Design a protein with these regions (language model features):
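Structural motif
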Residues: 247-257, 305
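Generic secondary-structure transition motif, activating predominantly at the C-termini of alpha-helices
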Residues: 52, 157, 176, 243-246, ...
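General structural signal for secondary-structure boundaries
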Residues: 140-151, 221-224, 267-273, 294-296, ...
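Amphipathic alpha-helical repeat scaffolds of TPR domains
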Residues: 255-266
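Membrane-interface aromatic/basic loop that binds lipid-linked glycans or pyrophosphate carriers
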Residues: 272-337
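Catalytic core of nucleotide-sugar-dependent glycosyltransferases
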Residues: 207-215, 221-251, 268-289
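Nucleotide-sugar donor-binding/catalytic module of glycosyltransferases
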Residues: 1-230, 332-336
C-alpha cells in the first residue's frame, strides 16, 4: 500500500532539513513524497533537494517536486499535492514539523485489517525546543459511525489539524474534499467536511508527530479582534459547503460540527454583547430554508433552532424568551457560555 506524503514548502529554511530527514528515516518504505514549492524566496527547496540527493535512504523512495511561479498559499499546495498523489492513502506534513521514524508504519498498521477513511495518531507540541503537552488524542481504536467521529471533534477528543493522519485517497477524491484558497484556519473547514463524510476512523495513541510552535506565526500572533472575522469566514464557508453536499452528509454530524465552529466564533472580544455575538453568528448563516429544514428535521431540533427562521432581533428575543427551559438551555450554553 503506497502512502503519498504532501509537504508544502515556504520560508522554512531553518526547519526543512529536519523535516525531510524524518521522512527519509521512515521504517515504512512504500512512500511517495510530494514537495510543493510555493515560490519560497529562501533556500528551503535547495536544502530539501540536497538533503534528498545526499542521503542513501532516498534511493527506494519516490519523490515528486511541484513548483508555483508565485506564492499561492498552503491550501493550494495541499490541493496540488492531492491531485498529484498516486498513493492509496494521503498524509500531510507541515515543513517546519517532523515525524517519528515509525510514524507511517504505526498509522498504516490498522489498515492491514480494514480500509479506514481516516487513521489518526497522537502528537507532541514543541515551543522553542522544549516539548510541551499538546491537545492529546482522546480516542482509541476503531470508530465506525460518522456521528461518533464528529462528536469527537465537538468534544475536543480529536484535533482539527490535517497533519498526523492518513486519509483514504479515494474517499477524499470521490467526495471532492479540497482546501479553500487563502481561507484562514483552512484545517478547521477541511477537517469538518472530512468528518461529516467519513464512515470509519482508527485512533492510535502513540505519538507519531512533533509540531513546532513558531514565534510570530499566524495563530500565535493574532488578537481576538482579528480572530473573530476569520472564524466567521470559516463558519460561513462550512454552511456554503453543506448547501452543496446535503444528500451525502450525516445530519447529526453536521449539527455537531456546527456547534464546534460556533464555539470558535464566539471567542469574540469580551466587550461584545450577547446580541452582537448572536448577530455575528446569524451573518455567517447563508443556508437556504431547505438546508435548514434538512438539518433541523426533528420537531425538537426545529423548535431549538426556530430563531434561525426569524429576523435577527426577533430570533434573539425568541431564544431569550425560552431561556431556562430544558429545550433551549443547551443551545444558549453553546452560544453564550
Amino acid at each position: 500500500m503506497k502512502v503519498s506524503i504532501i509537504i508544502p514548502v515556504y520560508k522554512v529554511e531553518p526547519y526543512i532539513e529536519r523535516c525531510i530527514q524524518s521522512v527519509l528515516r521512515q521504517t515504512y518504505r512504500d512512500l511517495e513524497v510530494i514537495l510543493v514549492d510555493d515560490c519560497t524566496p529562501d533556500r528551503s527547496m535547495e536544502l530539501a533537494k540536497a538533503c534528498i540527493e545526499q542521503s542513501p535512504l532516498s534511493k527506494d523512495l519516490k519523490f515528486v517536486f511541484l513548483h508555483h511561479e508565485q506564492n499561492q498559499s498552503v491550501s493550494v499546495c495541499r490541493n496540488d499535492g492531492i491531485d498529484a498523489a498516486t498513493g492509496e492513502y494521503l498524509m500531510f506534513i507541515d515543513s517546519d514539523d517532523y515525524i517519528t521514524d515509525d510514524c507511517v508504519e504505526t498509522l498504516a498498521k490498522p489498515l492491514e485489517n480494514f480500509a479506514y477513511d481516516i487513521v489518526a495518531g497522537n502528537y507532541e507540541l514543541h515551543d522553542n525546543g522544549f516539548g510541551i503537552q499538546g491537545a492529546p488524542l482522546g480516542l482509541r481504536g476503531a470508530i465506525m459511525q460518522t456521528k461518533d467521529i464528529a462528536e469527537s471533534i465537538k468534544t475536543y477528543k480529536l484535533y482539527c489539524a490535517v497533519w498526523n493522519k492518513l486519509y483514504n485517497a479515494r474517499f477524499i477524491k470521490d467526495n471532492k474534499i479540497y482546501f479553500q484558497k487563502r481561507l484562514p484556519y483552512e484545517d478547521e473547514l477541511w477537517t469538518a467536511l472530512v468528518v461529516c463524510s467519513a464512515k470509519s476512523m482508527y485512533a492510535e495513541q502513540r505519538i507519531t508527530y512533533h509540531y513546532e510552535i513558531r514565534d510570530g506565526s499566524f495563530t500565535t500572533s493574532e488578537t481576538q479582534e482579528q480572530n473573530l472575522p476569520r472564524c466567521m469566514r470559516v463558519l460561513q464557508s462550512f454552511y456554503n459547503e453543506i448547501e452543496q453536499r446535503i444528500p451525502f452528509l450525516d445530519v447529526d454530524a453536521v449539527n455537531m460540527i456546527e456547534e464546534r465552529l460556533i464555539v470558535a466564533v464566539k471567542s469574540a472580544p469580551k466587550d461584545f454583547t450577547p446580541f452582537k455575538t448572536y448577530s455575528c453568528l446569524r451573518q455567517c448563516d447563508t443556508r437556504s430554508w431547505k438546508t435548514k429544514l434538512w438539518a433541523h428535521r426533528s420537531l425538537k431540533n426545529a423548535l431549538l433552532h426556530f430563531d434561525q427562521y426569524l429576523p435577527a432581533r426577533l430570533g434573539y428575543a425568541y431564544i431569550k424568551a425560552l431561556y431556562g427551559t430544558k429545550l433551549i438551555k443547551h443551545r444558549l450554553h453553546t452560544l453564550f457560555s
